[in-house]
Amino acid sequence: MTNSRTNPKVDEFLSKAKKWKEEFEKLRTIILDCELTEDFKWMHPCYTYHNKNIVLIHGFKEYCALLFHKGVLLQDTDGILIQQTENVQAARQIRFTNVQEINELENILKAYIHEAIEVEKAGLKVDVNKNIELNIPEELQNKFDEIPALKIAFEALTPGRQRAYTLYFSQAKQSKTRESRVEKYVQKILDGKGLKD
């Protein structure tokens, strides 16, 4: 595909894709028909409008998906947007298990993409609830008690980074696993870095 809006990193991503390759290529064609610019962010094809993220293509074991960064602001007239987890506030997915589903939804997908572009043009913002109470796992609290500078560094992180850490630590079912997760990220927190930085 020789298009000034395509990105060679996405070409490489698609050439290496073992699963969902046909689906990814079809989604790419649909998105590029909507006049978005192709980028490669977070190890996935990402499509932007004036450098603002609109949609991202990604694949999982059971499905591939089109992720709308501000999906919560879309009307979702066809009821096909999915909230990935209860902790996801802004993004919404449309999931597929085969290329036929994508072909059948092509016009609807284009309508959703155009609506997402209009949301961006209008400057609409997602009202993210930053006041979600953090549940500090006991293992992290113990580490705070052991290293007071860690608590100070943690509290200096952005709310999103704090939340990402607490969710990640808390998701482990066993205390031993939570302890090892906390231990692994002590230095990153002290360095003021987020989980994915």
From Swiss-Prot:
Pfam families: DUF1801, OmdA. InterPro entries: YdeI_bac, YdhG-like. This is Uncharacterized protein YdeI. It comes from Bacillus subtilis (strain 168). The gene is ydeI.
